[in-house]
Amino acid sequence: MTTIASLVLAYLLGSVPFAVLVSLGMGLADPRSYGSGNPGATNVLRSGNKLAALLTLLGDAAKGWLAVWLAQTYGASFGLAAPEIAMVGLAVFIGHLWPVFLAFRGGKGVATALGVLLAVNPWLALIAAAVWLAVALLTRYSSLAAMVSAVATAVAAWFIEPGVYAGLTIVIALLLVRRHKQNILNLVSGTESRIGGKKKS
């Protein structure tokens, strides 16, 4: 029962739509109404408000980190071990992808995944961020950077955090890449928008 309750709470935390809340709180348009329509930091950046994008990024990452940190810190008292904590990390990530508060139409999960990784092992988060930054600087494609980063981090997890956390990282990477299906098609067709640019038609 404790495990189920933890997963439900993690999912609900992951469902909190910071992109929408921050945008509406700052008097901006709902990010689902422009650009890619994705409720995430990259799309919020297309509004031209860098602070809103940063706050969205921090909020989405924080909820991923908080869910896992709480499970790590207090879970042992309720019988939660590494497998259950990994499930909590997956639950908060899934909450962001398919949030109950947005009719199950959420974001791509990049920032939330980073937050989960930060709680699991800061080195994994550092690798993810470094790879994302390198690819983004070279190509200016946020989507490509996210996918390459996810795959690279999943590989690194086998050496840094073998076991259930490596499994968690791989599942997150698979889901994240799957959420970028349209971006992959856009990259192939040459219509994918670049960081700092307008969405191509």
Curated annotation (Swiss-Prot):
Probably interacts with PlsX. It comes from the Bacteria. Pathway: Lipid metabolism; phospholipid metabolism. This is Glycerol-3-phosphate acyltransferase. GO terms for molecular function: acyl-phosphate glycerol-3-phosphate acyltransferase activity. The chain crosses the membrane at residues 4-24, 84-104, 116-136, 157-177. It is a multi-pass membrane protein. It is found in: Cell inner membrane. Belongs to the PlsY family. It catalyses: an acyl phosphate + sn-glycerol 3-phosphate = a 1-acyl-sn-glycero-3-phosphate + phosphate. Signal peptide: none annotated. Keywords: Cell inner membrane, Cell membrane, Lipid biosynthesis, Lipid metabolism, Membrane, Phospholipid biosynthesis, Phospholipid metabolism, Transferase, Transmembrane, Transmembrane helix. It is an enzyme of class 2 (transferase). GO terms for cellular component: plasma membrane. Its main location: membrane. Its EC number is 2.3.1.275. The gene is plsY. Catalyzes the transfer of an acyl group from acyl-phosphate (acyl-PO(4)) to glycerol-3-phosphate (G3P) to form lysophosphatidic acid (LPA). This enzyme utilizes acyl-phosphate as fatty acyl donor, but not acyl-CoA or acyl-ACP. One of its GO terms (biological process) is phospholipid biosynthetic process.
